[in-house]
Amino acid sequence: MTNSNATAHATLHTSEGDIRIALFGNHAPVTVANFVGLAQGTKDYTTTNASGGSEGPFYDGSIFHRVIDGFMIQGGDPTGTGTGGPGYDFVDEFHPELKFDRPYLLAMANIGRPATNGSQFFVTVGKTPHLNNRHTIFGEVVDEDSKRIIDTIAHAPTDRADRPVKEVTINSITVEP
């Protein structure tokens, strides 16, 4: 899989800098549509978003609430606790061309059971083959500057619950074709 297979690009505007990600809508169409809809505020959700509202962009103001150096950085929870989501779950989309065989892949977090995707996502910072066919891969970080920002976040000091000591905020997400 290469970034030339991208159907859209998302830019996560974070407190550490911009992270540009290619989205693989041809391989994970439901997941990409969910992520884009939540990012743009065009998809309905039944919980409070990270800004405290019930409509509009879901991720704006959320944080990377779980960071494990050498493994991944996780965000997308409006509560910042690891337990929040949009109020619904949706199906997994495993594609044979998408494997956790390299770092910087964007995937959905879940609760360890099938079809429990919601809004939480993570970006890997190493090879994680044990996640194959357990988490839907739907994108990949596209450039070296973005990878450096991911690495900076991954190396951030954390507490015992893997939460960064200094919050790393997703200010907004923009999506382009």
Question: Locations of the language-model features?
Answer:
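Cyclophilin-like peptidyl-prolyl cis-trans isomerases
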Residues: 1-177
